[in-house]
């Protein structure tokens, strides 16, 4: 029986409710396909090398992310066109106001709510409908087949250490060693960005706020 390893990044030992929904939907897909599902709650990528050595499919979800149900089949099914890792692009945090102004002045027909958004992934040539070759990414949601990656990392004279601190550096390394990385352009990734409220800090126990 094949195994799907789902890695979910936690904050303060918790995950977002929408991430949980994605995990539950993946569980149903695995049951339908006769796959074994293992969920790992992680704080970083320190456990990733061990999972790669298992040779099984991995699915990574950063904290506060989820993936639309229509695309979840790509997480569990064999990748198309020889792809060995699949990226699900998402919007970066914040708004690029310079980009928004430039597009607006140029008369862009793009929806107003999207003109200032930047994505974490750029693509190359089209491989198939909804599938593109990766150019560059810092994706927070992705899937990978462990067996070909492990073979490339350990196949040379000197084993290659995969950089884990940066998503961009990790995928750049994967491309450089010959891993074919695809981009699922039809994926909808919703990201929840957390911010510390300054007011909550000031109203902590023992702190008195003057009127």
Each model region followed by its residue ranges:
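Short amphipathic alpha-helical segments and helix-helix/interface helices
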Residues: 48-49, 72-76, 168-172
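Residue-level marker for beta-strand->alpha-helix junctions and adjacent short loops that shape enzyme
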Residues: 9-13, 65-66, 93
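N-proximal low-complexity "stem/linker" segments adjacent to membrane-targeting elements
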Residues: 1-46
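Short beta-strand-to-loop acidic/aromatic patch adjacent to the donor-nucleotide binding site
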Residues: 55-68
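Conserved catalytic core of nucleotide-sugar-dependent glycosyltransferases
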Residues: 68-158
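C-terminal catalytic/acceptor-binding lobe
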Residues: 2-5, 11-14, 131, 136-211
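Glycine-rich, basic loop-to-helix element that forms the pyrophosphate-binding segment
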Residues: 40-54, 70
